Amino acid sequence: RSVFPLDIIKLTVPDLYVTIVHPQIEVRTADARSILKQQILLKDAIKQWGNIAGLVAGLEQGNYELIGRSLEDVLIEPTRSILIPAFDQVKKISKELGALGGGISGSGPSIFMLSTNEFTAKSVEIAMGQIYDSIGLSCHTYVTTINTNGIQLMDAS
């Protein structure tokens, strides 16, 4: 199946909060791409496709447990995470605080975590900031909800 034409499908997304931390480092997309494996094992591909299907189904069904189980990237994250200081610590602490899961946003260095409520999302935000403070790296953190409207043209005036 080709991605041309691109199919754009609107998902029904449950109320989720997104916590994002952006460490003040540069990760060039070209560098992040250059370290990826050119070939993957079939067992890893099968697991990744299952996780993607589980994530889409979990979002559509509002099944938080399935969303959490499916937020595992076995192809890209293990390699790219080495470019992001404290990545593993941020992910571990966030899940301990109740986040469903998360991962690398784009090629990095931003990390996102999904939570079912604002209290958890804010707790994750505080912990993310503390982790980067403890290693002497500035960061910006954000808590928001998922935009279900998609791209919109805004008046610049």
Segments predicted by a language model, with ranges:
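ATP-dependent small-molecule kinase catalytic core of the GHMP/sugar-kinase superfamily
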Residues: R1-L97, E118-S157
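Glycine-centered loop/turn positions within well-structured domains
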Residues: P109-I111, N149
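Short acidic/polar active-site loop segments enriched in Thr and Asp
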Residues: L100
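Short acidic/histidine-rich active-site segments
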Residues: I104-S107
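Short hydrophobic/aromatic beta-strand micro-patches
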Residues: F112-T116
